[in-house]
Amino acid sequence: MADAEDIQPLVCDNGTGMVKAGFAGDDAPRAVFPSIVGRPRHTGVMVGMGQKDAYVGDEAQSKRGILTLKYPIEHGIVSNWDDMEKIWHHTFYNELRVAPEEHPVLLTEAPLNPKANREKMTQIMFETFNTPAMYVAIQAVLSLYASGRTTGIVLDSGDGVSHTVPIYEGYALPHAILRLDLAGRDLTDYLMKILTERGYSFTTTAEREIVRDMKEKLAYIALDYDQEMETAKTSSSVEKSYELPDGQVITIAADRFRCPEVLFQPSFIGMEAAGIHETTYNSIMKCDVDIRKDLYGNIVLSGGTTMFPGIADRMRQGNHCLAPSSMKIKVVAPPERKYSVWIGGSILASLSTFQQMWIAKAEYDESGPSIVHRKCF
């Protein structure tokens, strides 16, 4: 890595729902596209159309009407490596237009993922893409870098997995990390179910994307759920309409806050788990009593599923009810939190002190994929 100065590392945050990719040192990702691989449902009859057997990302999204869409990552864990390779290939060659064999690559991963997952990631980077060096970083830790803190508890909630990671003076506290397999995709599925009950049919993988868009545009989190329900029954202030691609208009009211309420009450979808506010509290309680005060004062939200309006207030109120009454609770919701994992990766990969942390190809050739557990936290 002697000539590392003139080579920009690549940062690729492979989310369950979206891939965020770009160059270290930039302040935002260059490429953001859905982690989707689509395959045609029908046989092609017109010759010379240049039809492909698989489409990736935005192209798959735009042709979704004729494709079966598959997400290769589920709950933050790669379930289909062939499709994942397609996504990485698309990221490097089509989106960023770089040769991966010329750049170190920083990848991200959810905490408490199976060890085999990061080993396979390492193997593909070195053997398929021939990268000179790579590193796998924990997503929530990167979000804390992006917020400019060294102490705090990060609630990172994306499309596939949510987790709380307490960090004190730069040290992650692994015994207190909690993972909740409840995130954006579960909310989308729940909204699909609610809409089906109301007589709208959303069943295919392509229609799920419409519901996801509806969720992102219209859903919000009520500060007091029961009271908001009463308001919705009597007044029309909550009503919003959404136009489907075919021009049909749907009106949704109470469903706007019923859908993301699942984050705080997972029992809505039959999950026997604590809500995100309680998970954060449980995570803090697993930490040493001396550092809890600092964690309560620095609850940092990150990831796309924390973008709902009203989430910070509700989070503060939820923890206020659980924590000691005199405790000062501060919830930080940075406006760029949708991309804060990527931004943190960009910061980390461009630090001069980080340059000796990369796993070099030579080290990989010597030790094999298991090197990733020794070099990456």
Curated annotation (Swiss-Prot):
Q: Known Pfam families for this protein?
A: Actin (PF00022)
Report a single Gene Ontology molecular function.
ATP binding
Q: Quote the subcellular location field of this record.
A: Cytoplasm, Cytoskeleton
| Keyword annotations from UniProtKB, A to Z | ATP-binding, Cytoplasm, Cytoskeleton, Hydrolase, Nucleotide-binding
Annotated GO CC locations: cytoplasm; cytoskeleton
Q: Which domain of life is it from?
A: Eukaryota
Keyword hit for Cytoplasm: yes
EC id:
3.6.4.-
Q: Which reaction does it catalyse?
A: ATP + H2O = ADP + phosphate + H(+)
rRNA-binding in keyword set: no
**Of which family is this protein a member?**
Belongs to the actin family.
What the protein does comes down to: Actins are highly conserved proteins that are involved in various types of cell motility and are ubiquitously expressed in all eukaryotic cells.
Protein name in the entry: Actin-1
Query: Could you tell me which species this protein originates from?
Result: Sorghum bicolor (Sorghum)
